[in-house]
């Protein structure tokens, strides 16, 4: 699967995102997404559709109803960067 991406691996054209794209991007990073992680990615996309922005981690944790600490345990590199990357969303800026 060949998709245009930024230097950090984010989709250049977010409209090319799909569940298949999400799983392929994760696979390329040697990440097997759990059901919980897929749900978080879908909720991040929902939040973005409603607010036209990527939420800060504290806001996102409340939005999905998961403790912030648990989010960090599920995503070893921190939650919002892989969630937005695999979700076809813009790369977060600032403190996430």
Regions found by a protein language model. Give the residues of each.
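Short capping/connector residues at structural and topological boundaries
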Residues: 16-17, 38, 76
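Helix-rich interaction surfaces within compact, conserved domain-sized segments
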Residues: 5, 56-96
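Amphipathic alpha-helical segments that form the core helices of the histone-fold
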Residues: 41-48
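A general alpha-helix detector
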Residues: 21-25, 43, 56
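N-terminal first-folded block
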Residues: 1-29
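Flexible coil/turn residues that form the inter-helical turn or adjacent wing/linker of helix-turn-helix
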Residues: 53
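Short, Lys/Arg-enriched anionic-surface-contact patches
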Residues: 28-41
């Amino acid at each position: 699967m060949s998709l245009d991406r930024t230097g950090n691996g984010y989709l250049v054209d977010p409209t090319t995102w799909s569940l298949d794209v999400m799983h392929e991007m994760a696979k390329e990073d040697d990440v097997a997404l759990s059901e919980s992680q897929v749900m978080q990615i879908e909720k991040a996309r929902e939040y973005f559709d409603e607010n036209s922005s990527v939420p800060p981690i504290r806001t996102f944790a409340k939005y999905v109803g998961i403790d912030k600490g648990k989010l960090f345990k599920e995503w070893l590199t921190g939650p919002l960067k892989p969630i937005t990357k695999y979700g076809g969303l813009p790369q977060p800026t600032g403190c996430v």
